[in-house]
Amino acid sequence: VTVALMWEARAVAGRGGELLDWARRQTLAQEPMRRETFRAPQDRVLVVTWWDAAYDADLPELPEPDGSLVTRTVHRWRFEQVADAPAPG
């Protein structure tokens, strides 16, 4: 099963670049199959990691950044991959 972990944080206004640099520097205890980092307006950063694991597996996640860098606690989501529906017809 492929599991995707999503980690999203919002930096204090004008500090999105610092948050992005911080997220890129974070290492995990295990290497995921894939890791991608995104940015968005309002100084937001998203990191998605993909794992070959059960949905409820104990997987390493990025920590909370220093409170002076972010406006709120990190949002975290976990998803499992499902097969695409067959094309109609």
Task: Identify the residue ranges that each predicted region occupies.
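Short amphipathic alpha-helices within nucleic acid-binding modules
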Residues: G17, D52-E61
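Feature marks short, surface-exposed loop/turn motifs that line or immediately flank catalytic pockets
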Residues: A13, P41, A54-Y55
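Short amphipathic alpha-helical segments
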Residues: A11-R34, L62-P65
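Signature tryptophan residues that serve as conserved aromatic anchors
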Residues: W7, W50-W51
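Short glycine-/aliphatic-rich beta-strand segments at the starts of folded cytosolic domains
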Residues: T2-A11
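Soluble, non-membrane globular domain cores that form compact, hydrophobic packing
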Residues: T2, T27, A57-P60
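Glycine-rich beta-strand-turn "strand-cap" elements at beta-sheet edges
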Residues: V1, M33-L46, L62-G89
